Design a protein with these regions (language model features):
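Short amphipathic alpha-helical segments and helix-helix/interface helices
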Residues: 37-40, 63, 85, 138-139
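Flexible, charged surface loops at secondary-structure boundaries
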Residues: 42-47, 65-68, 114-116
């Protein structure tokens, strides 16, 4: 059943944020960096800005660990996205509604306008997939903003999986989680369509490699 009542949606967001803090808060987190300066904690101190990209299925990882007001995240403007938006807003994220595909121009303009507030966060395979595919809007956003793209690989240990297009991961209590940061991808300021596609493919390649590494790592912990 679809929830349409705005007050009920807000209430679900409050409850969702509480559950995320309680559930994901029991997780033991591990991080690996190809370049330590892209660590959001370090960038927060130095004032550096990045576009952080992570797959839709592992949204609960950054939703808990990096829920800061300077993290501006793009959430789908589909009806289902409203519940996610209300939840991450109450966790502490800055929220932009839209996607890099459907209605993408408006969302990209608004994300570009948020650069002075902090980092930009994207689930590049959202809102409807294909799973672990990077859409073209991500390198275009990097072109517009001049920010490097850091495509993260994340994994939970033996998570519950939703029967959805992305196999959304819900961590089990007191489990472990890993995050691998590859080198950032920098989109040239004069990039045309062909170069943008090359950058898109490179981000996707690095994200898949980092995800494989994160999944292999968490299985050994």
């Amino acid at each position: 059943m679809k929830i349409q009542n705005p007050a009920l949606i807000r209430a679900v967001g409050v409850a969702g944020a509480f559950l995320v803090r309680r559930l994901v808060g029991t997780t033991e987190f591990h991080f690996r960096y190809a370049d330590p300066t892209v660590n959001p904690e370090v960038a927060r101190r130095t004032g550096a800005r990045y576009i952080y990209a992570f797959y839709h299925e592992v949204l609960l990882f950054p939703a808990y660990f990096w829920a800061w007001p300077e993290m501006q995240i793009l959430i789908s403007d589909h009806r289902d996205g409203e519940l996610i938006a209300q939840t991450v807003l109450r966790l502490g994220f800055g929220v932009v509604r839209g996607s890099t595909t459907r209605g993408g121009a408006r969302a990209l303009r608004e994300m570009t306008g948020r650069v002075d507030r902090g980092h930009l966060c994207i689930t590049p395979d959202g809102p409807k997939g294909p799973r672990r595919h990077v859409h073209q809007g991500l390198p275009y956003l990097a072109l517009r903003t001049g920010l490097p793209i850091v495509g993260l690989g994340m994994a939970f240990s033996n998570p519950w999986r939703a029967k959805s297009w992305d196999k959304f991961a819900v961590p089990r209590p007191y489990g472990k989680a890993t995050c691998v940061f590859p080198e950032p991808v920098i989109v040239p300021p004069d990039a045309g369509r062909e170069v943008l596609e090359e950058c898109r493919a490179e981000v996707e390649r690095r994200m898949r490699k980092a995800t494989d590494e994160a999944e292999e790592w968490v299985a050994k912990l």
